[in-house]
Regions:
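Generic alpha-helical structural context detector
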Residues: 132-135, 152, 173-176
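Conserved non-catalytic scaffold segment of RNase H-like nuclease domains
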Residues: 1-117, 124, 140, 144-162
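Acidic, divalent-metal-coordinating active-site segment for phosphoryl/phosphodiester hydrolysis
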Residues: 163-176
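Short alpha-helix boundary/capping motifs
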Residues: 79-81, 129, 139, 175-179
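Active-site catalytic pocket residues across diverse enzymes, especially alpha/beta-hydrolases
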Residues: 115-119, 178-179
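Short alpha-helix plus adjacent loop in nuclease-associated cores
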Residues: 128-144
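Short, glycine/acidic-enriched loop or turn micro-motifs at the edges of active sites
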Residues: 11-13, 132, 170
């Protein structure tokens, strides 16, 4: 796959809408052309211990951050002219790029739920899953299909796992190799 946006969310608690950081990597013609990272004030705005242990973010990190609609608007505004995100309605548009995520079920659910939380229209974005692709591509040759394992198998050293931008960059690397 040569044109896509790799995306990753971290959440503050068990609610999929509680996105507290986003990382996104735009890939065009197989090359990274733009990255985006932002902290987000989560909704609901509380942190569970187990989430803090995963990504290291705490309430103080996002207390003054923008809420999701403003972060989303900023991310979309930073896309190069003419580029937009592929949805089921724009699947034939050559300037529409799909999302790619590792365990896309999680990230697509987070995106759908945070859109719903803020009463934003969700256009059924198209997602491709590097986790599913790795299970097919590496069938049986990897110990597991966790992001850092698959990234290493694709020649990428993921050193800051569970930082949304680092994870999105690893996902982009994987997608360029196996999708």
């Amino acid at each position: 796959m040569k044109d896509f946006i790799a995306i990753d969310f971290e959440t503050a608690n068990e609610c999929p809408s509680s996105v507290c950081s986003i990382g996104a990597v735009l890939v065009r013609d197989g090359e990274i052309v733009k990255t985006f990272y932002s902290l987000i004030k989560p909704e609901p705005d509380y942190y569970k211990w187990f989430c803090q242990q995963v990504h290291g973010l705490v309430h103080e990190d996002t207390d003054c951050a923008e809420v999701f609609p403003y972060v989303w608007e900023r991310m979309i505004a930073e896309l190069p002219d003419g580029i937009h995100i592929q949805s089921e309605d724009t699947s034939d548009d050559p300037d529409a790029v799909p999302f790619v995520a590792h365990n896309a079920g999680f990230d697509s659910r987070c995106l759908r739920e945070v859109f719903r939380c803020y009463r934003m229209d969700y256009p059924e974005f198209v997602f491709h899953d590097t986790l599913a692709a790795s299970r097919s591509h590496f069938s049986g040759s990897l110990e597991n299909h966790q992001l850092q394992t698959v990234a290493a198998a694709c020649g990428y050293d993921l050193t800051n796992h569970h930082h949304a931008l680092a994870d999105a960059e690893a996902c982009a690397w994987i997608a360029r190799k196996i999708l």
